[in-house]
Structure formats: structure tokens, C-alpha cells
């Protein structure tokens, strides 16, 4: 059975933060380091057992800084991925928790997927 091909668009946020050690769940932001999406996927290889993941870099910023301009950029990147690679079966967007629901709501309204 072939694995689904899934694009993973990275936008930064908590999920991409690099702590001082693996259990740094509180003060990770003080380290001021973030994974780009391909580095994040390499750090957690287990999902690769379930799908062929295609990393797509967009930006790596705190989710508190994401707003309308970024939402448009995310939507444009989703459309670009779909248009450029018809073999993509799905898209995952990594995102921090602070504005996740706003981004999801915006994409629900405007994405033409």
C-alpha cells in the first residue's frame, strides 16, 4: 500500500521552538531558536512511517505575530502547493497556538481546496 503524499507547510510558533533540552516546555522561547519545517520533520521521524511528508517552508515566526497579511500568504502557499504538485493528497500547516483558531477560520472562509 502506498503512503499518502502530504505537504507540511511550516509557519513557526510553539511547535517549531527549540528548547534548551527535550523537556523544556516552559522557557523554550528564551532560547530564541526555531526549527524550519524540514528540520522539524527530521527531529520527529515517526510521522514518516505513515505518510510521504513534503516540507514546504513559508516562515517561522511566533503565532502572536501572525495576522491578515500572513493568512493571505498561507492561503497563497496552499494554492501554490496544490497547483504545482498534483500528487499531493493533503496539506498540514504547522502553527503556534496563540492564533491558530483565527488562521483556521480565515482559511476555512477563503481556501479553495
Spans of model-derived segments:
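Short Gly/Thr/Asp-enriched flexible loops that form oxyanion-binding sites at enzyme active sites
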Residues: 93-113
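N-terminal glycine-rich anion-binding loop in soluble enzyme alpha/beta folds
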Residues: 2-83
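Structural motif
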Residues: 89-90
Amino acid at each position: 500500500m502506498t503512503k499518502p503524499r502530504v505537504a507540511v507547510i511550516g509557519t513557526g510558533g510553539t511547535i517549531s521552538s527549540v528548547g534548551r533540552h527535550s523537556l523544556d516546555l516552559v522557557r523554550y522561547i528564551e532560547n530564541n531558536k526555531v526549527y524550519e519545517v524540514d528540520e522539524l520533520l527530521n527531529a520527529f521521524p515517526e510521522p514518516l512511517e505513515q505518510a510521504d511528508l513534503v516540507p514546504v517552508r513559508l516562515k517561522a515566526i511566533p503565532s502572536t505575530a501572525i495576522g491578515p497579511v500572513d493568512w493571505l500568504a498561507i492561503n497563497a502557499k496552499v494554492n501554490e502547493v496544490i497547483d504545482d504538485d498534483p500528487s499531493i493528497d493533503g496539506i498540514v500547516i504547522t502553527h503556534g497556538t496563540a492564533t491558530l483558531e483565527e488562521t483556521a477560520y480565515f482559511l476555512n472562509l477563503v481556501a479553495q481546496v
